[in-house]
Design a protein with these regions (language model features):
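Ribonuclease/tRNase effector modules and their secretory precursors
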Residues: 1-88
């Protein structure tokens, strides 16, 4: 069983960038929450303090970029994209 960090259980906060990408990439908050619920792993992102979460959606691999906000105990979701798409 995968060990998740403490911030994994924090409430989600969505960035304005994510909200735009949800529309562009045709996925919903429910889709995103499902991706995170069934995520298979995580690794540090190139941006300090951020993490890349590996997930699946519509039978494709996706990456969800998150940033824990310890002071607020929130997990800020920065963006989400299919792994074969460029990150914008």
């Amino acid at each position: 069983m995968k060990q998740w960090p403490p911030w994994w259980a924090w409430e989600l906060e969505f960035s304005p960038h994510l909200l735009k990408r949800m529309e562009d990439r045709r996925f919903t908050e429910v889709d995103l929450r499902r991706m995170l619920e069934h995520a298979t792993g995580y690794r540090p992102d190139v941006a300090p303090g951020r993490w890349v979460v590996s997930a699946r959606h519509r039978r494709r691999g996706w990456e969800v970029i998150v940033e824990p906000l310890p002071a607020e105990k929130l997990l800020l979701v920065i963006t989400a994209y299919p792994v074969d798409a460029s990150r914008t």
